[in-house]
């Protein structure tokens, strides 16, 4: 029987807790193995890597970087491309733009071996947009590349579906949303904003990319 291996790329704000959750609930989720890729060997990240390995995840690094990690006491089990091609599912949690680059340079190359590739909200165009409980019916077994939309897009889509679409899709005419979030995630020590900041609207039609993503999300259901 084929082993179910989940490979997470990136150990930042999204990647680190996700890897930990997958390890902790491995049996309940029916996962045989969790692997993760770390790009840079950083002293400040050692405790994070040690914890993830202790919880059962296996570390993968770029070919040629093994020595850098070992110098800091981190022992890689896998090489980057090896970890990708042996996985059942890839979850890309890298910063904006990196997921698209990974798709072009690595994921498409191994698309005949890996069942599915998931990327985060910033990777517009990576694949079909998806939000849990919103457009589940739009998913198809042929959808190999999926973009999990951002938290703000999830919020707007959930409110829209609950208030305007639950009974009849024709109820939705227009919606205006204001999203307020904390200054930083706990794992983000830089660029802290100690007071409210209002951002510019970068999308002429929808205002923000979150709203545009929400519209694209509902378009998968044939609504827009």
List the predicted regions and their residue ranges.
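C-terminal substrate-binding/catalytic lobe of Rossmann-fold NAD(P)-dependent dehydrogenases
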Residues: 169-224
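N-terminal Rossmann-like NAD(P) cofactor-binding subdomain of oxidoreductases
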Residues: 2-182
């Amino acid at each position: 029987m084929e082993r179910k291996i989940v490979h997470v790329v990136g150990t930042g704000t999204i990647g680190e807790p996700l890897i930990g959750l997958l390890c902790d609930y491995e049996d309940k989720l029916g996962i045989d193995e969790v692997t993760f890729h770390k790009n840079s060997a950083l002293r400040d990240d050692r405790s994070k890597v040690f914890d993830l390995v202790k919880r059962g995840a296996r570390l993968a690094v770029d070919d040629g970087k093994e020595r850098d990690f070992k110098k800091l006491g981190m022992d890689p089990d896998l090489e980057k491309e090896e970890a990708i091609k042996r996985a059942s599912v890839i979850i890309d949690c890298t910063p904006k733009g990196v997921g698209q680059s990974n798709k072009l340079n690595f994921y498409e190359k191994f698309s005949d071996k890996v069942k599915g590739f998931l990327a985060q909200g910033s990777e517009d165009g990576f694949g079909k947009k998806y939000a849990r409980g919103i457009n589940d019916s739009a998913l198809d077994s042929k959808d190999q590349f999926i973009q999990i939309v951002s938290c703000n897009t999830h919020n707007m889509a959930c409110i829209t579906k609950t208030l305007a679409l639950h009974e009849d899709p024709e109820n939705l005419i227009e919606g205006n949303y204001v999203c307020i979030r904390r200054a930083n995630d706990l794992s983000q020590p830089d660029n802290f904003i100690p007071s409210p900041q209002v951002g510019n609207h970068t999308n002429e039609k929808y205002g923000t990319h979150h709203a545009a993503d929400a519209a694209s999300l509902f378009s998968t259901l044939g609504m827009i």
